[in-house]
Design a protein with these regions (language model features):
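AAA+ P-loop NTPase catalytic core and its hallmark functional loops
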Residues: 1-137
C-alpha cells in the first residue's frame, strides 16, 4: 500500500492528497537523488499532525518537530519526505560542528584542491531550501 493510500485510510482530505500529487509532479527529483527518497517501513499515525504538516508544506512553510525522545519525530520526518517524494539527508550535530561541516570545505584529492560539499550546500543545490512562494520570500 502506498503512503498516499495510507493517508486516505487515515482520513486525510482528498483535496490535500491531490495537492500532494500536484506538488510531486511540479517538483520532480533528479535521478541522482532518487535513492535518497525514503520508503518508510513504519507509518506515522496521527491525522491532525498529518493535516497540519501537509498544509504547511504546501503553503511553503517550514516545520519544526519538537518533543521528547522516542515520540516519533524521525519517523514522521521520514514519512513526510516519502509522501512528498523528497530526498532525505540526516545530519548529526555535535559539539565540534562548524560552518564548513554544514556548507562544505576545500579538500585535497588526487593532487588537486577540490570543494567537498556539505549537506546544506547539497540541499540548496537540489532546490530543497526556499520552496516558499515568491510573495513570502
Amino acid at each position: 500500500m502506498s503512503l498516499l493510500d495510507k493517508l486516505r485510510e487515515l482520513g486525510i482530505s482528498e483535496n490535500l492528497i491531490k495537492e500532494i500529487e500536484k506538488f510531486r509532479s511540479q517538483y520532480p527529483v533528479d535521478k541522482e537523488y532518487e535513492s535518497r527518497i525514503p520508503v518508510p517501513t513504519q507509518f506515522y499515525y496521527g491525522s491532525d499532525v498529518w493535516e497540519q504538516a501537509i498544509t504547511a508544506v504546501l503553503c511553503g512553510e517550514n516545520l519544526l518537530l519538537v518533543g521528547e525522545k522516542a515520540t516519533g519525530k524521525n519517523l514522521f520526518a521520514e514519512n513526510l519526505a516519502g509522501v512528498f517524494n523528497r530526498p532525505r539527508w540526516d545530519v548529526s550535530f555535535h559539539v565540534n560542528m562548524d560552518a564548513a561541516s554544514l556548507i562544505g570545505t576545500d579538500t585535497f584529492c588526487a593532487g588537486e584542491v577540490t570543494f567537498r560539499p556539505g549537506p546544506v550546500y547539497t540541499a540548496a543545490k537540489t532546490g530543497e531550501i526556499g520552496r516558499a512562494s515568491c510573495r513570502e520570500r
